[in-house]
Amino acid sequence: MRYLLIVFLLTSCSADFEYPATKKERTNYNLHGTTVMDPYFYMEDFESPYAVQWSDQQNALIKNYLQDSEITNIQSILTEAYSSEYYSLSFFNPDSDYYFYNSGAEQHHLYMKKGEDAAVILDPNTWAEDQTLNLDKVSISPNKKYLAYSISNGGVDWRTIKLMDLETNQNLGLEITEVKFSDITWKADSSGFYFNKYPKPLPENRLSQQSYDAAIYFADIETGEEKLFYGEINPEQNYTVSFIGDDKDILINVITGSEDENFYLYGNSPQVLEPITPINQANFSYVHADNEGLFFITNFEADNYRLVKILFADYQLIEIIPEKDFALKGVSFVNDYAIADYINHSDMRSAIVFFNTSGEELDISLPDTLSGTISGFQSAGENTILFSLNTYTQPTQYYSYDVTEASLDLIWEEIIPGFNPKDYVEVSTNYKSKDGTMVPITYSYKSSTDINKDTPIFLYAYGGYNISIRPSFTPKYAAWLELGGVLAVANIRGGGEFGKAWHNAGKLSTKQNVFDDFLYASKFLEENSIGNRKSTAISGRSNGGLLVGTTLVQNPNYFGAALPAVGVMDMIRFTEFTEGWGWRGDYGSPILNQADFQRNIKISPYHQTKIDVCYSPTLTTTGRRDDRVVPSHSYKFTARLQEYQGCTNPVMLYDATRAGHGSGNGVAMPKWKRIELFSIEQSFALKNIKQ
């Protein structure tokens, strides 16, 4: 890379506001024979004083811009929507001693103990004045004497693990750092636990340094010593560990980045582990063990996934539940049942099928009145199971089902203040994309809303990494629906809704399909007088942020507003930060591979923004401590879009301080920050689509 040290200040103006001055450098690099101009390359040092000051100025701009908008009203509705009481399902399970609880007033859930000695075990609300120290994982030792738990600081992916004595409720002084993407797995004798650890990054690059060389460590709780348990020479591998038969045998899941393929190692010590699944040929997910072998959900020779068993005796793979027409998303072993969750193609909701553990389909079914995303199956006695259900407009419900009596009881329901599920409608259908492929879409609205060509539309999609978007309730959309808007969710290609083939149709050389699918979702709604393109705000996060950014620049001034969040906006240099190298399964390796470079440069939002083109009103959001998709992606894209914007449509940035990659859960940001972020997004959208 070379730098021509010519620096000047760029200021963009409109009739109503003035963008902060932004430094521009003549920076370029040559890649595969192509000169790539990168005038905002310096923003990759996103913790520099200049970048922080620039971000603060952008935050001030968006807040000033929204002073005369719906933001106060939206904040009020969302504050009420986020004030519901919450219990985790374990509260209703007689075999569980601990649960999560929130009265509605707390920023984070409390971790509680049930019974006569009921008590608050962990209260993350007391850990930091701004509520940005957050509880992540909890794991209780087999002897129930100890609790190991992990903490996130300001939304980053890095975790610190601490240890508590459950008899005294006192911390024991153990503190393990440099933990990331890790479970906490106890040894059967409760002498310690296993976790994933990375080499310590340089302090100045902690949020951006590439993460390699993960290894499994054992924490001895008596000595406090951290001992290396397993680590291979491949720097790109990550692991999860399970123990079979009271620690007699070890099962290690070997994962390379976010590749869909993985493999498992098995043996009785780290020195004699051997692969028991095909190496990086398919996806395997361990779900259960019995005396004969290990059960896995896999797409090995089954695009829609199936349940298989690998025998201990000879590692032979036998089929338990064969592949069906619907994609298999999960299997829960509860009592004597293997309960399979399939995606119903008509509405993306759960189609639940009961099998015995030998794979025989049973004459058992949940009542037809239940419709939604069903999950969390637990045993509550020999014949009783517990589970949860929700949809886009139905907050969480917990049910108890007596299998022998076919008796269903609603045992708890989340009540969202000011929100009555009976007042809302969900419609699921399909639309034709550019190449004729039929794509599912679900749109929701308040029954009293007059749906017409001017109705505000919030159109969301993801489209990547085999992730299936299924109906689930989140309070963030309560204000949008309450104010007369429509929430539309498109299940575009790149996800896992229709199995492996659907994923393959939206990655690498087929990635353009996801942008076409998203655009044609908007066209479908407009053609059916469900809003119009100018009353539509398009939204997506992470890979979905890329989706919004690319759809935006490929279709200038088409939408009413665009809301790319924590998106991968530089599709050339994403591999150079934290876990970016692990996204090659969907994005390729543009720095190393010429074909990947030539493809990605055409769909990269940062590189495809053109001078003097009028783009739709755009609010890009990120987290200043996002160490997964680093904020420089959003900074660079915003700077270039502000520079090149060819009309007075606003181009703005909101950078949530002390926040990381996620927004829908408390691990990434506390409740008050979520309300602030969602209020800004929706206020920006409404202000622009109403003009």
Please state what every model-predicted region is.
Residues 120-184, 190:
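A conserved hydrophobic secondary-structure block that centers on an alpha-helix together
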Residues 112-114, 162-167, 210-222, 264-268, ...:
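Beta-propeller blade signature
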Residues 97-99, 144-147, 192-193, 250, ...:
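Hydrophobic beta-strand positions that form the internal "hydrophobic ladder"
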Residues 125-138, 151-155, 170, 403-406, ...:
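Cap/lid segment of the alpha/beta-hydrolase catalytic domain
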Residues 492-691:
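Active-site-proximal cap/loop segments of hydrolase catalytic domains
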Residues 11-12:
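C-terminal motif of bacterial Sec signal peptides marking the signal peptidase cleavage site
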Residues 49, 53-139, 150, 237-266, ...:
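Non-catalytic accessory segments flanking enzyme active sites
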Residues 152-153, 196-212, 343:
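Short, conserved, GDST-rich strand-edge loop motifs in beta-rich repeat architectures
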